[in-house]
Swiss-Prot record:
Pfam families: NAD_synthase. Homodimer. It comes from the Bacteria. It comes from Bacillus licheniformis (strain ATCC 14580 / DSM 13 / JCM 2505 / CCUG 7422 / NBRC 12200 / NCIMB 9375 / NCTC 10341 / NRRL NRS-1264 / Gibson 46). This is NH(3)-dependent NAD(+) synthetase.
Length: 272
């Protein structure tokens, strides 16, 4: 088995999918997990990008079906901007498409700013922009878990195969969640699900961005990764890619293994 094949198997990626069936399976997963845990619904941060739009719509469909079955469940969508978000119109368009039961908005700027100021006061040095970006992601996670805990809701994560293979998420930030309905999907497969669901086209054709850096606002994921999502998706779907692309993806995959595992202990073998 090649490393490419091993990665495909580990991340549960299929070379091709049928969007309608995938939607049904993933909504079914959300419903089954909620019933198993006894929780009362879901919470998810909505950015206006492809991944949270898709996960949010799946969550809303799941709770609506549960209510039709006589099980009370709700979905809370939460906006978590850092000050004024440049693509706020997209976030509002995503909420209009998702139609969540409830939506809240928390501006995380003051919380992040207070921490950054305290960090500089205590250590004598400014928090680097990259690490401040990770603080933003983790404050968003804390907010979602506060809402979830207060309302007995499960926190949904938006991680998918293209992020998992590259480790392109913040550990205990956007990587902190209770369940992941997009697992196994490549970026283009996620787009096909949104097309099937009738999402506004601009929400899945826009350039994806984590938008965590003050110094590089709206920097695209592809610029930060040095790889295109088409390259990553081709690799994950078992297609031929250049040796340079394969090496870059595999290097990131190996370096980010710790992000796909629970914290290491001396009894684990994965890190050896």
């Amino acid at each position: 088995m090649t490393l490419q094949e091993k990665i495909m198997q580990e991340l549960n990626v299929k070379p091709s999918i049928e969007p309608k069936q995938e939607i049904e399976k993933r909504v079914g997963f959300l419903k089954s997990y909620l019933k198993k845990t006894g929780a009362k619904g879901f919470v998810l941060g909505i950015s206006g990008g492809q991944d949270s739009t898709l996960a949010g719509r799946l969550a809303q469909l799941a709770v609506e079906e549960l209510r039709e079955e006589g099980i009370q469940a709700e979905f809370i969508a939460v906006r978590l901007p850092y000050g004024v978000q440049q693509d706020e119109d997209d976030a509002q368009l995503a909420l209009k498409f998702i139609q969540p039961d409830k939506s809240f908005a928390f501006d995380i700027a003051s919380t992040v700013g207070s921490f950054a100021a305290q960090y500089q006061s205590v250590t004598g040095e400014a928090l680097a922009d990259f690490h401040k970006g990770n603080v933003k992601a983790r404050v968003r996670m804390i907010t979602q878990y506060a809402i979830g805990g207060q309302n007995q809701l499960l926190v949904i994560g938006t991680d998918h195969a293209a992020e998992a293979v590259t480790g392109f998420f913040t550990k205990y930030g956007d990587g902190g969640a209770d369940l992941l309905p997009l697992t196994g999907l490549t970026k283009r497969q996620g787009r096909s699900l949104l097309e099937e669901l009738g999402a506004p086209e601009r929400l899945y054709t826009k350039s994806p961005t984590a938008d965590l850096l003050d110094e590089k606002p709206q920097q695209s994921d592809e610029t930060e990764l040095g790889l295109t999502y088409d390259n990553i998706d081709d690799y994950l779907e078992g297609k031929a890619v250049s040796s340079e692309v394969a090496e870059a993806i595999e290097k990131r995959y190996k370096a980010s293994e710790h992000k796909r595992q629970v914290p290491a202990s001396m009894f684990d073998d994965w890190w050896k």
